[in-house]
């Protein structure tokens, strides 16, 4: 693999969006041109809402659990094959700074109260969303999308006196119809046709 200076990025600015489970990502070409601060203006990629302010000190963390493997062998060959014993579970965690209905809904699940001015918490609710994270570094944009994720609180609410309060939320990627569990998006980095030299 050759060095590609254009594939190196600094996560200087980023945005996180949610939509109903199954919401499609912007196309790679569209990702280059959309106004990231106004998802309501996106034509060809509708259904997304910004989660608002997220932590600058603790950026989204893309992680996984499981995926362990074992080496199995036969009588003739001790190390014949590596077998994955369980599927990995991929996720992204985000620290939300806004204490509004949408953020509390991502942290606890949908508002269980109909009383004006009250956010009610009811445990055991299903909370599934599509998620889109866009990292912006100058002219470069790198998108990360999952059609369906189980959304839940990832840790205790953070209430420091010397920093912004935060709601740690985890999006665990789930199967959605025949779609891939998640994808990375950039028109210039992935599946780019090779141009013959000369």
UniProtKB/Swiss-Prot annotation:
The subcellular localization recorded is: Virion
Predominantly, its location class is virion
Keywords tagged on the record: Capsid protein, Virion
Cite a GO CC annotation.
viral capsid
Name of the molecule in the record: Major tail protein Gp23
Q: Which organism is it from?
A: Mycobacterium phage L5 (Mycobacteriophage L5)
């Amino acid at each position: 693999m050759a060095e590609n200076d254009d594939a190196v990025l600094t996560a200087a600015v980023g945005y996180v969006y949610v939509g109903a489970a199954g919401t499609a990502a912007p196309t790679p070409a569209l990702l280059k041109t959309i106004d990231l601060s106004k998802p309501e203006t996106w034509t060809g990629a509708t259904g997304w809402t910004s989660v608002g302010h997220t932590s600058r000190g603790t950026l989204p963390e893309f992680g996984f659990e499981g995926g362990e493997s074992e080496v199995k062998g036969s009588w003739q060959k001790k190390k014949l094959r590596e077998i994955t014993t369980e599927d990995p579970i991929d996720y992204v965690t985000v620290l939300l700074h806004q204490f509004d209905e949408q953020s509390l809904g991502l942290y606890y699940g949908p508002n269980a109260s109909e009383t004006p001015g009250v956010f009610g918490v009811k445990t055991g609710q299903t909370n599934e969303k599509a998620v889109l994270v866009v990292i912006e570094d100058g002219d470069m944009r790198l998108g990360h999308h999952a059609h369906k994720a189980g959304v839940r609180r990832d840790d205790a609410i953070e209430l420091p006196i010397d920093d912004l309060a935060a709601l740690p939320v985890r999006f665990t990627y789930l199967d959605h119809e025949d779609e891939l569990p998640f994808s990375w998006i950039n028109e210039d980095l992935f599946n780019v046709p090779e141009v013959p030299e000369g």
